[in-house]
């Protein structure tokens, strides 16, 4: 079950990087709040 662990680590890492960039730079998509 090593593949499952590696997949989880990969997804979690990409998720952290994505959220870091997402919250640092507000998306230009029409955000209506």
Swiss-Prot record:
**Gene Ontology terms, cellular component aspect?**
chloroplast thylakoid membrane; photosystem II reaction center
Q: Which GO terms describe its biological process?
A: photosynthesis
List where in the cell it is found. Plastid, Chloroplast thylakoid membrane
Q: Where is the signal peptide?
A: none
In the bilayer, the protein is annotated as: Single-pass membrane protein
Membrane-spanning intervals of the chain? 3-23
Give the UniProt keywords, A-Z. Chloroplast, Membrane, Photosynthesis, Photosystem II, Plastid, Thylakoid, Transmembrane, Transmembrane helix
Q: Could you tell me which InterPro entries the record lists for this protein?
A: PSII_PsbT (IPR001743), PSII_PsbT_sf (IPR037268)
**Assembly and oligomerization:** PSII is composed of 1 copy each of membrane proteins PsbA, PsbB, PsbC, PsbD, PsbE, PsbF, PsbH, PsbI, PsbJ, PsbK, PsbL, PsbM, PsbT, PsbY, PsbZ, Psb30/Ycf12, at least 3 peripheral proteins of the oxygen-evolving complex and a large number of cofactors. It forms dimeric complexes.
- What functional role does this protein have? Found at the monomer-monomer interface of the photosystem II (PS II) dimer, plays a role in assembly and dimerization of PSII. PSII is a light-driven water plastoquinone oxidoreductase, using light energy to abstract electrons from H(2)O, generating a proton gradient subsequently used for ATP formation.
Q: Which family does it belong to?
A: Belongs to the PsbT family.
Q: Which PANTHER family match?
A: PHOTOSYSTEM II REACTION CENTER PROTEIN T (PTHR36411:SF2), PTHR36411
State the name under which the record lists this protein: Photosystem II reaction center protein T
Gene (UniProt): psbT
């Amino acid at each position: 079950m090593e593949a499952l662990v590696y997949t989880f680590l990969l997804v979690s890492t990409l998720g952290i990087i994505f959220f870091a960039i997402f919250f640092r730079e507000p998306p230009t998509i029409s955000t209506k709040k």
